[in-house]
């Protein structure tokens, strides 16, 4: 019943292939970790468009069903079954997305040991702030995913209810109200998550442009 857009982390415009060898500086190793994190999040990024398309289709199905009368119960049941399949597909994408983010989070965890090895105090402080932002981002994504799955559970229950001929208006309104409340949570978390992602991207850009960071990579 609503559509959300999720921000993604951006990679470096130009990246030297360094590979974290024994001779790599902490700065080089840190950049490798950050760019590998982008790679790990790629499946998550790729899931966004099809997920949004499914959300749009579900919205259309919902509006069509709500426009039908009880005399068209066969059509309501047919469309509800289609909507239930839509819910299952969205759940699959969310699960793939979460797997991608879990792997990215695990990869990014390596950043900490390289940040601790940075010699420049100001650079280290900047990198620690970036790390804190990314950790907060992953925490928000976990909350967002949990809330979105609650929405899908609510949607599934709704379309199962709509297939019943003895469904009352009171039951329908109660379920729709419950789903809308969860959507409000998703919307709020989505906004916070996108803000945190943009904050991380800016922090990463600033870190890469820091002269102390560039010097140690040369």
Where are these regions (language model features)?
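C-terminal motif of bacterial Sec signal peptides marking the signal peptidase cleavage site
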Residues: 16-19
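Extended amphipathic alpha-helical segments
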Residues: 58, 62-65, 76, 115, ...
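Immediate post-signal-peptide N-terminus of mature secreted/exported proteins
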Residues: 22-95, 99
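Bacterial N-terminal signal peptides that target proteins for export
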Residues: 1-8
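Extracytoplasmic/luminal low-complexity segments enriched in Pro/Gly and acidic/polar residues
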Residues: 188-218
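Primarily heptad-repeat coiled-coil rod domains in cytosolic scaffolding/tethering proteins
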Residues: 25-28, 32-35, 71-74, 78-81, ...
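Extended amphipathic alpha-helical interaction segments
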Residues: 97-179, 186, 206-214
